[in-house]
Amino acid sequence: MARIASVNIPDNKRLVVSLTYIYGLGPAMAAEICNKAKISKDKKVKELTDQELISLRNIIESEYKVEGDLRREVTLNIKKKKDIRCYQGLRHIRKLPVRGQNTHSNARTRKGKAIAIAGKKKAVK
């Protein structure tokens, strides 16, 4: 397995698919990296030479924010929104959907497991 940006990428897959295993790289960005490195997208990772792997590493490290740096930036952005107490920050604090989704009938994933209201009984006449 080749190691790029501290991630083991699979050998038996095409280069474009393997690069998407790195957090922050999608299919379009992976294709762009292959073009910059002048490597065929259809080439398997196990067929790459050491020189090609080095060029891929250099391109990714110098031009793109991936893995730990990107995760850190995202968490800092969320923390900043929480600190200034803007609308999105408040939604993060309350663990509700941030981008305007409905919460009346959906949003179970974000809100967590449904909790029954204990002791609530219908009023008896």
Curated annotation (Swiss-Prot):
Xref: InterPro entries: Rbsml_uS13_C, Ribosomal_uS13, Ribosomal_uS13-like_H2TH, Ribosomal_uS13_bac-type, Ribosomal_uS13_CS
GO biological process: translation
Presence of keyword Transcription: no
Pfam families, per database record: Ribosomal_S13 (PF00416)
Keywords: Ribonucleoprotein, Ribosomal protein, RNA-binding, rRNA-binding, tRNA-binding
Superkingdom of origin organism: Bacteria
GO cellular component: cytosol; small ribosomal subunit
Annotated coiled-coil segments of the chain: none
Family that this chain belongs to: Belongs to the universal ribosomal protein uS13 family.
Subunit structure: Part of the 30S ribosomal subunit. Forms a loose heterodimer with protein S19. Forms two bridges to the 50S subunit in the 70S ribosome.
NCBIfam families: uS13_bact
Free-text function comment from the UniProt entry: Located at the top of the head of the 30S subunit, it contacts several helices of the 16S rRNA. In the 70S ribosome it contacts the 23S rRNA (bridge B1a) and protein L5 of the 50S subunit (bridge B1b), connecting the 2 subunits; these bridges are implicated in subunit movement. Contacts the tRNAs in the A and P-sites.
Name by which UniProt lists this protein: Small ribosomal subunit protein uS13
Gene that specifies this protein: rpsM
